[in-house]
Amino acid sequence: MRTLALLAAILLVALQAQAEHISVSIDEVVDQQPPQAEDQDVAIYVKEHESSALEALGVKAGVVCACRRALCLPLERRAGFCRIRGRIHPLCCRR
């Protein structure tokens, strides 16, 4: 019975070590891949001393805006347009 428990413990330790190795390998692969701007939103935080170009669009200081791929989210309004890799997207700001 002790032998069976010892073998089970050794098996569990070996499986855990293998799982950690796989996890590290996956993290390395994810780190090596370049981020795809087309699949991500770009957040913009407007400070008081920033350029007045966004203020001209009605965006006030302290507002968080994002360059969205498609439509603005329900609690956002379109404040203008932005570019990601040359493509024009809506600039959405929280209300």
Curated annotation (Swiss-Prot):
Cite the InterPro entries for this sequence: Alpha-defensin (IPR016327), Alpha-defensin_C (IPR006081), Alpha-defensin_N (IPR002366), Beta/alpha-defensin_C (IPR006080)
Lineage of the native species? Eukaryota, Metazoa, Chordata, Craniata, Vertebrata
Please give the chief subcellular localization of this protein: secreted
The alphabetized UniProt keywords are: Antibiotic, Antimicrobial, Antiviral defense, Defensin, Disulfide bond, Fungicide, Secreted, Signal
Signal peptide as annotated in the record: 1-19
Q: Which GO terms describe its biological process?
A: antibacterial humoral response; antimicrobial humoral immune response mediated by antimicrobial peptide; cellular response to lipopolysaccharide; defense response to fungus; defense response to Gram-negative bacterium; defense response to Gram-positive bacterium; defense response to virus; disruption of plasma membrane integrity in another organism
> Which stretches of the sequence are propeptide?
20-62
Which is an annotated Pfam family here?
Answer: Defensin_1
As for family, the record states:
Belongs to the alpha-defensin family.
**Localization per Swiss-Prot or TrEMBL:** Secreted
Tell me, what does this protein do in biology?
Host-defense peptide that has antimicrobial activity. Inhibits corticotropin (ACTH)-stimulated corticosterone production (in vitro).
- Descriptive protein name: Defensin alpha 4
